Amino acid sequence: MTIFTKNSVPLRARVETMSAFSLPSVNPSRADSEVILHAKVEAFYYDRFLALRNVYLPIYKNLITTLIGPSGCGKSTLLRCFNRLNDLIPQTRLQGQIIFKGRNIYHPLEDAVVLRRNIGMVFQKPNPFPKSIYNNVAFGLRIQGYRGDIDEIVEHSLRQAILWDEVKNKLKENALSLSGGQQQRLCIARMLAVQPEIILMDEPCSALDPTSTKQIEALIKEIKQQHTIVIVTHNMQQASRISDMTAFFNTEMIEGSRTGELVEYDHTPVIFQNPTREITRQYVNGYFG
């Protein structure tokens, strides 16, 4: 089986069958991003239910990768595999490997808590702690025993999250008093404070109004300079606006149940304007979902 090479961004990375990739030649002018995370998932199960299979997906450093596809195709399941949040669900198991910076994160000796410091998650619904705005951002630093200037990092993180000017005079107020969009940006600031290398986002704008969505999208584009970002979204316009790479997933009937699988993965303009697979074209044009 041919696998993606480490330091290349393929122009036509796609699944021709359910078990193998077909790769064309890579344009050297585009092969300028290294693979920071590489999913090689043969199968993922919830108890006996096969939720996902045959996913071989490289994630490129300092790029925004979106995972798209209809509900139930395994996008969020795969996202949670990237920092082992699925470990918290009883009777789940992964067959395969997920390689982060050369190490299999599912190796028995790998510490999932340490992993999650390097690969953080922003959820669909904002989840600020019932603490002050300041203490929300400082929380992770204190847990890690950080001994530097916490005030400086709190301010810097809030500025990165485009929130500082809105909250600088009320840092002692309860974070739950903020609007939904502000709470989501606070959650991002809280994560940025501990400087993860990869940020996972599971539909981060689905519960937000258009103005807040625009702010979050601007923030995502800004922070990709220092972070690698992977986003699950059902919003095709959002995926086409903000992402560099797009992976399209769909479902296949297997033994009476629908199992998710990767259909096509390429640069975002290719997926939306000239996809290889007809089913990809139908999905991004809204013919099913």
Curated annotation (Swiss-Prot):
A Pfam family hit: ABC_tran
Biological-process GO terms, alphabetical: phosphate ion transmembrane transport
Record keywords: ATP-binding, Cell inner membrane, Cell membrane, Membrane, Nucleotide-binding, Phosphate transport, Translocase, Transport
GO molecular function: ATP binding; ATP hydrolysis activity; ATPase-coupled phosphate ion transmembrane transporter activity
EC number: 7.3.2.1
Localization annotation: Cell inner membrane
Binding locations of ATP: 69-76
GO cellular component entries: plasma membrane
Keyword check for Cell membrane: yes
Domain ABC transporter stretches: 37-276
InterPro entries according to UniProt: AAA+_ATPase, ABC_transporter-like_ATP-bd, ABC_transporter-like_CS, P-loop_NTPase, PstB-like
Catalytic activities: phosphate(out) + ATP + H2O = ADP + 2 phosphate(in) + H(+)
Main location: membrane
Top enzyme category: translocase
Record function comment: Part of the ABC transporter complex PstSACB involved in phosphate import. Responsible for energy coupling to the transport system.
Subunit-structure text: The complex is composed of two ATP-binding proteins (PstB), two transmembrane proteins (PstC and PstA) and a solute-binding protein (PstS).
Family: Belongs to the ABC transporter superfamily. Phosphate importer (TC 3.A.1.7) family.
Protein name (record): Phosphate import ATP-binding protein PstB 2
Organism of origin: Trichormus variabilis (strain ATCC 29413 / PCC 7937)
Lineage, opening ranks: Bacteria, Bacillati, Cyanobacteriota, Cyanophyceae, Nostocales
